[in-house]
Amino acid sequence: MAALAGTIAGIHFDLWDSYGYRHIPHIGPLFLLDAAAGVVLAVASLVLPARFVALAWLGVSGYGAATLAAVLVSLWSGLLGFSETTSAPLLAPAIAVEAAAFLIGAGAALRARHRTRLLS
């Protein structure tokens, strides 16, 4: 889970830093905030005690869902005045990792929650 959150964070920071997304009004600061959130979630999923790990994984799942939804909205109708194109840099890897974070994170959180209930 940490790797997925970290990868999403890295993609957003790279787009912000190397591809000029920092200059897009409203979207630029959100990309930097998104990168920071991914780092926090990656660290949290590694250092939280076992009883809270399902919460961290659920956070990674929500993070993946939110970033995936944002990119899809920006592709289809635009988001905050910005419309993404299908030729955008890192678009395919971003969609793949965000979808994986959502699906794997949700499954891992449910499994961890179930396992915690069995041990209680």
Regions from the language model: what does each represent?
Residues 1-120:
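Membrane-interface extramembranous regions
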